[in-house]
Amino acid sequence: MAAPQLFRALVSAQWVAEALKSPRASQPLKLLDASWYLPKLGRDARREFEERHIPGAAFFDIDRCSDHTSPYDHMLPSATHFADYAGSLGVSAATHVVIYDGSDQGLYSAPRVWWMFRAFGHHSVSLLDGGFRYWLSQNLPISSGKSPSEPAEFCAQLDPSFIKTHEDILENLDARRFQVVDARAAGRFQGTQPEPRDGIEPGHIPGSVNIPFTEFLTSEGLEKSPEEIQRLFQEKKVDLSKPLVATCGSGVTACHVVLGAFLCGKPDVPVYDGSWVEWYMRAQPEHVISQGRGKTL
C-alpha cells in the first residue's frame, strides 16, 4: 500500500534534477522553498532563499499565507487567501508542486505546506526528500536572486477533515475518540525544557503521546522507510488503525506526524492547527501536564 503513496509524498533529489531538465507540459513542475524558522534562531528564510535556491523555485512565506486575524501563529488562511497566494507563485490546478526547506534537519517546515496544499484540495504535491540540505550534498545546481513567478489561476476549497480545533481536543479529553501525537522535542513535551515563545510554558495535552519530529528522519535528513516509521508508531503505542491527530508547538512540525502516517498508508490524520500555543493560552491549569511549573491562574 505504501509504495504508490511514497512516490506522491516524497520525490528524490535526483528525480527533481531530471524533471527540471525534461519538463512536461501536461504537468508543469513548481518548486517551492517553504523555509521557516523560529524567531529566536535569528535566521532570515527569505534572504537565505535569495542567496541560493533550487533553480526555478519560488519562496513560500508561511507567515504571509496565514490567518492574520488570529492571535495564534500562522493559522490556516481562508481558501481565497490560499488560492490567491498559491496562484501568485505560479501554481495552477495542473501543477505538480514539490516543496522543500533549508533546515539543518533536512525537512522541518516544508511538510506544513505539503499538508496545506492537500487541505485545500491540491493533491499533486510532494516533498523533496532530504530537503535543500540533501540537494546540496549531491552537488546539484543552485540559483540565486528573487526568482519571480508567472502568476497562474488556482482554486482552493478547504476540506475541514484536515483540521482539529481547540474544542475538538478539549472534548476528546473525556471522549477519547482519537489519539493525539505531539511532535515537539521531548523536553518541551515533558515540561523540563523551555518553549521558544515568550509567555508559553512547556508541557503537554493530557493523554497525548510524544514522537519528536526528528525521529521520522535519518541522520542524513532523509525520511525513514514506511517500515521503520510503522515500528516507531508501534513503539510509542500509537495504533494506526484508529483515529489519530497531530499537534506540536504551532502546527508546523505536527505535519511530520501526518507525513509519517501517510507513508504508512494512513492519509487521514488531521492537525490541531492552534497546537500547544493555543492550548496553553486557553487551557485550565489541570489541562497542562508538566514536570515543570505548568500553568497557574
UniProtKB/Swiss-Prot annotation:
Swiss-Prot/TrEMBL catalytic activity: 2-oxo-3-sulfanylpropanoate + [thioredoxin]-dithiol = [thioredoxin]-disulfide + hydrogen sulfide + pyruvate + H(+)
Record PTM N6-acetyllysine, positions in chain: 40
Compartment annotation: Cytoplasm; Mitochondrion; Synapse, Synaptosome
Regulation: By oxidative stress, and thioredoxin. Under oxidative stress conditions, the catalytic cysteine site is converted to a sulfenate which inhibits the MPST enzyme activity. Reduced thioredoxin cleaves an intersubunit disulfide bond to turn on the redox switch and reactivate the enzyme. Inhibited by different oxidants, hydrogen peroxide and tetrathionate.
GO cellular component: cytoplasm; mitochondrion; neuron projection; synapse
Modified residues (N-acetylalanine): 2
Residues that coordinate or bind substrate: 188
Tissue specificity note: Expressed in liver, heart, kidney and brain. Localizes to tubular epithelium in the kidney, pericentral hepatocytes in the liver, cardiac cells in the heart and neuroglial cells in the brain. Also expressed in vascular endothelium of the thoracic aorta. Weak expression in lung and thymus.
Record-linked SMART domains: RHOD (SM00450)
Phosphoserine: residues carrying this PTM: 35
Domain Rhodanese: 25-144, 174-288
SUPFAM superfamilies: Rhodanese/Cell cycle control phosphatase
EC number: 2.8.1.2
GO terms, molecular function: 3-mercaptopyruvate sulfurtransferase activity; identical protein binding; thiosulfate-cyanide sulfurtransferase activity
Entry annotation: catalytic residues: 248 (cysteine persulfide intermediate)
Record's keyword terms, sorted: Acetylation, Cytoplasm, Disulfide bond, Mitochondrion, Phosphoprotein, Redox-active center, Repeat, Synapse, Synaptosome, Transferase
Primary role: Transfer of a sulfur ion to cyanide or to other thiol compounds. Also has weak rhodanese activity. Detoxifies cyanide and is required for thiosulfate biosynthesis. Acts as an antioxidant. In combination with cysteine aminotransferase (CAT), contributes to the catabolism of cysteine and is an important producer of hydrogen sulfide in the brain, retina and vascular endothelial cells. Hydrogen sulfide H(2)S is an important synaptic modulator, signaling molecule, smooth muscle contractor and neuroprotectant. Its production by the 3MST/CAT pathway is regulated by calcium ions.
Protein name: 3-mercaptopyruvate sulfurtransferase
Gene of this entry: Mpst
